[in-house]
Amino acid sequence: TAEPTPTPEPTPLQFTTVDASYFDDALFIGDSRTVGIAEYGSLKNATYFADVGLNVYVAQTKAIAVKNVGTVTLPQLLSQKTFGKVYIMLGINELGNDLDDITAKFSSLIDTVRAAQPDAIIFVEANLHVGPSRSSTDATFNNPRIDKLNEKLAALADGKTIFYIDINELFD
């Protein structure tokens, strides 16, 4: 009898340095944190679908002013422009809700992006931790709960066309 061929270990992807033009075809979807990146960050060539208080429950229906595009819903934006990369950072505003429900809505959002932008790489961004004093005194907005949500969001990544990015270790 033939021995089964062992499945090779996948080669981990390596981070690389890129110049700003890498973000020419990037879309950032997010809440106030993403608004801050759009207004104060250096990636002025990217497209931002971001608004203070944006969450997964309204992200597909809310009309938002997008620079050089106009006021559009996310499905309208996705049908008007082609994106090679889509970064999504949502979840902190929803933290008072059921984590499985948040994850299901996030998954639906990914499905909407994938249907409209089949060739885009999607990056699910971890929710950033809150400060230690907030975490230790708030029953909802605390780092253990944020970590639980982030674990669920990480599970949405397939490592092929959907990737999970967690930069909390850089800030903790």
Positions of predicted regions on the chain:
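Extracytoplasmic/secreted cell-surface and envelope-processing proteins
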Residues: L95-L99, G131-A139, D172
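Alpha/beta-hydrolase-fold catalytic nucleophile elbow
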Residues: M89, E125-A126
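Generic structural signal for well-ordered alpha-helices
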Residues: F106-D111, N150
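Conserved SGNH/GDSL esterase-like catalytic core that processes O-acyl groups on lipids
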Residues: T16-S108
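Substrate-gating cap/lid alpha-helix
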Residues: G131-I167
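N-terminal, intrinsically disordered, polar/charged segments of Gram-positive cell-envelope systems
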Residues: T1-D24
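N-terminal cationic-hydrophobic initiation segments that often serve targeting/anchoring roles
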Residues: L78, V113-R114, A154-A157
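A short helix->loop->beta-strand "cap" motif at the edges of active sites that frequently abuts
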Residues: Q117-I121
